[in-house]
Amino acid sequence: MMTEKSNGVKSSPANNHNHHPPPSIKANGKDDHRAGSRPQSVAADDDTSSELQRLAEMDTPRRGRGGFRRIVRLVGIIRDWANKNFREEEPRPDSFLERFRGPELQTVTTHQGDGKGDKDGEGKGTKKKFELFVLDPAGDWYYRWLFVIAMPVLYNWCLLVARACFSDLQRNYFVVWLVLDYFSDTVYIADLIIRLRTGFLEQGLLVKDPKKLRDNYIHTLQFKLDVASIIPTDLIYFAVGIHSPEVRFNRLLHFARMFEFFDRTETRTSYPNIFRISNLVLYILVIIHWNACIYYAISKSIGFGVDTWVYPNITDPEYGYLAREYIYCLYWSTLTLTTIGETPPPVKDEEYLFVIFDFLIGVLIFATIVGNVGSMISNMNATRAEFQAKIDAVKHYMQFRKVSKDMEAKVIKWFDYLWTNKKTVDEREVLKNLPAKLRAEIAINVHLSTLKKVRIFQDCEAGLLVELVLKLRPQVFSPGDYICRKGDIGKEMYIIKEGKLAVVADDGVTQYALLSAGSCFGEISILNIKGSKMGNRRTANIRSLGYSDLFCLSKDDLMEAVTEYPDAKKVLEERGREILMKEGLLDENEVAASMEVDVQEKLEQLETNMETLYTRFARLLAEYTGAQQKLKQRITVLETKMKQNHEDDYLSDGINTPEPAVAE
């Protein structure tokens, strides 16, 4: 038996962690003794490296510790690097926004329990895994699936009807149709399964219970139509022949999914008017296509070329190939349904009936086109028309008041800037139908980068922040406009969103400082901080260099907002004092004097309150004393009456008692 040492040093418990002696082996190949077991508590993601380490230890006597161990170490390094780089990192939330929004709402689902606990937890784990395959109808994956299922539905609606009418189309591309038909059938079956795994909202929560999902879908009309659309009517091919695609007309019953895709796309798209027009055009083209196919089928049943109304005889080479057949029928259908006319008049009664029906459909199509397109164009131009009406009203007023041409040109340029930069939308009017919570969240998301730079909002309470954001009013200033002048009473504070402002001298030319996007001014003057050397007046002239987009918060709006948040008001005032102290604009003597005045006023108020309490206490004490006296008097009267009643009872008992009989 041979025992291996590491560098001539006997292994000990202290160094077993670094050097694991290999097991001793007999000549016959059997283990003489087993190596001491070492603890192996490894995570699931370390299984690979642990197995490689074990192989390295077993392979050490034959190959040495150098080469293979370096390979194992390299594999471990690569694995750690891959896990570190490919692990998805959650985006860090913005703390400023989280103070308002609060923690993220976790996904909550409803399910029916059976009231029985699983002994080993396997049933519960299986159900949880099964619930992972429930699609949220408001999610992106569900929308993508609607697109997938809409394609075979549209394929069947267009080509299945055409193949049933144009026999050449069916025969010439039979293999292609066979593949597409059964591919669409596969998608239909998959859609039926997905519908069984599509969640729905119950009391505002997404239901993922399989039984509820199944019952919710099976008891609907759509389930019956979906099942009817996948009935294997292709078996009729064995009776009527393979070139009879009309036996698959039940596939047209799956139309609801295509309409659902169109509805969701109209909601999701950023260009709803364009999509509505495209959708309307698609419907009209499908109707014209169907009408062309029906015209060809009627011509086939009557006979090609038997009169001037039907399709010409297909024996004529000019009209005997597939492309000419379809284009001719599509042309005839378009002329008829658009009521343009100029088509051969009908000859037979059935031809007259079909043309009358087509004319009625054409009138409805024309009315639909005019109505929908007119409505869409009106909606698209509504904003422009409203804005133009405002400009016309201002122009009329300036002409009536004989405003100078320079001022009129300035006003027109201001309106032009608003329209060019898409600043004509009234945010309050657009968002008025949303609840206050959503309006505030949208405002914070839109104006977050600007609000974060306002110093007095840094430690602002979330509720007050909501109130202030909703009260911000956008204002646009033209080049050369004064936002405020030195000595003016400050009634608003301003936050610069876009543009450049200059702090200028009284001459309006000399510039002292330049304010850019994110800067704010006037926030101290609206807080009425006592001891401020600035008071509530502006100390500088601020002028717009170009067109500037600002947010305005009035003093009245701020005071109205902080009325319900007295603690937040104190925080704002304290932060304002800190800013004034840093800038040397706080008069401490005046602050101390104001504090003394405040203390004196509070003492006087306290004395007044104490006097009021004393008066109320004296009145209550007098009422209590009077009530006690009345109570005592009533008790005395009751005692007197009780004594009198007792004496009367005693006397009556003595008179009515009979004398004892005398014994004779």
UniProtKB/Swiss-Prot annotation:
UniProt binding sites for 3',5'-cyclic AMP: 538-539
The keyword Cell membrane is annotated on this UniProt entry: yes
Selectivity filter: annotated span: 339-342
Annotated region (C-linker), positions in chain: 382-458
GO cellular component: ciliary membrane; non-motile cilium membrane; plasma membrane
Entry-linked SUPFAM superfamilies: cAMP-binding domain-like, Voltage-gated potassium channels
UniProt KW keywords: Calcium, Calcium channel, Calcium transport, Calmodulin-binding, cAMP, cAMP-binding, Cell membrane, Cell projection, cGMP, cGMP-binding, Coiled coil, Ion channel, Ion transport, Ligand-gated ion channel, Membrane, Nucleotide-binding, Olfaction, Sensory transduction, Transmembrane, Transmembrane helix, Transport
Quaternary state and interactors: The olfactory cyclic nucleotide-gated channel is an heterotetramer composed of CNGA2, CNGA4 and CNGB1b subunits with 2:1:1 stoichiometry.
Protein name per UniProt: Cyclic nucleotide-gated channel alpha-2
Protein species of origin: Mus musculus
